[in-house]
């Protein structure tokens, strides 16, 4: 199974002042997909604490996917991208762009998210916003991508046609000769 780490970044949640609804939404999504929630933690908005967990989960536990929630906005304490950026070896900008685009369908404020997506070793790391709506938007984007992405990172060769596209007897060439 795909092994997932869920890291909530929130001063309020880490202090026990607020319920971690966004992390709970990710856990529910992981279960609904049949993935394994291999690690879950809540940390304050501190670069060192965030980076420490990311390093452990990517390098030691070698999780397939790490989803962070929170700390991606413009506020002075929002530092999740700053903690993530130095640790990822390769970017996956299309994922972060797609998450922002999905959010923009519902609120213009989604454009203010600075969340990143990238790869460390064989782990895909994705920063999601802290709001439950932002998390749901992000999970909608990740849903059709995760298994293919993890397969590629594992060195497997999954089929390249996404569900409902080409394959299954359909011609990938439009307007070509009969």
Where is each model-derived feature located?
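Non-catalytic beta/alpha edge segments that cap or flank active sites
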Residues: 1-178
